[in-house]
Amino acid sequence: MAYGAPQCAQHLPPIGTPTLRQRSVSCYHFFRHSRGFLWFVLCNLLLTPNISDAQLLINVQNQGGEVIQESITSNIGEDLITLEFQKTDGTLITQLIDFRNEVQILKALVLGEEERGQSQYQVMCFATKFNKGDFISSDAMAKLRQKNPHTIRTPEEDKGRETYTMSSWVQLNRSLPITRHLQSLCAEATDATYVRDVDLKAWAELPGSSISSLEAATEKFPDALSTRCNEVSSLWAPCLCTLETCIGWYPCGLKYCKGKSVGGDTSGTQQQQQQTNYRCGIKTCRKCTQFTYYVRQKQQCLWDE
């Protein structure tokens, strides 16, 4: 987001925080003198604050020693957390957690191999049941601040790899019973949004949900296909694809410290020290996720060779 900002930002006053009026005037001045209508629109998009979201930018060192930047956004009103980063190979990963519906969406935008006949990129989405204890709440996330934003972070705990075998496609135009965020986030993955039967059954236990409405939003994979894409020679044959991604750093829990508070007895003649617990930090984790799912052509899974 910030890469387009400098040309607009140079027209802002160098000292102090500009008001919304000053921001509008600065962008208008830029538009008037450069006749750059697109830049005028971009200025407004970049400089209009969103008071409902809180964002952290985290520098994370991956296992290969490379540093990537994660963007973690918390929306308390929607009870959402969105984590996004770009891998060194250009793959863009977006993780959205919908706490209200206990849904986690992982979206992967993978750059295509044009020399092998692929389009510029392809998008896949995986919707799974989210366990609330796996990530701190949106409210707690919104309260986090960095003392040293340029520090390179490494997680305290490696949670290893979790494997998911997907069983159905999601029909995005019917996906509201799962979460309303699927259709917007995964709009480019119309034929490549996946879910598991076991998660449908778990969501059906939530208040206001039903297995019939959830199943109506999905289409099962063809039966009796067990051939992995790395075992198939034809680029046009169906197969089971595997995609793995790792979240290198995320807040997976809160830390509590013990303190002492002074309290009185009922008579008020004695005071005693009592142990109390208070929040004093976060626990950070790393986790990899491997998805196995059906593709209609091996051409859609060239990385799994």
Swiss-Prot record:
Q: Which InterPro entries match?
A: Oaf, Oaf_C, OAF_N
Keyword presence, Nucleotide-binding: no
Q: Which Pfam families match?
A: OAF_C, OAF_N
Supply the alphabetized keyword list.
Developmental protein
Instruction: From the UniProt record, list the coiled-coil ranges.
Output: none
Function text: Vital for proper neuronal development and hatching.
What family does the entry list?
A: Belongs to the OAF family.
Q: Which PANTHER family match?
A: OUT AT FIRST, OUT AT FIRST PROTEIN HOMOLOG
Q: What is this protein called?
A: Out at first protein
Record organism: Drosophila virilis (Fruit fly)
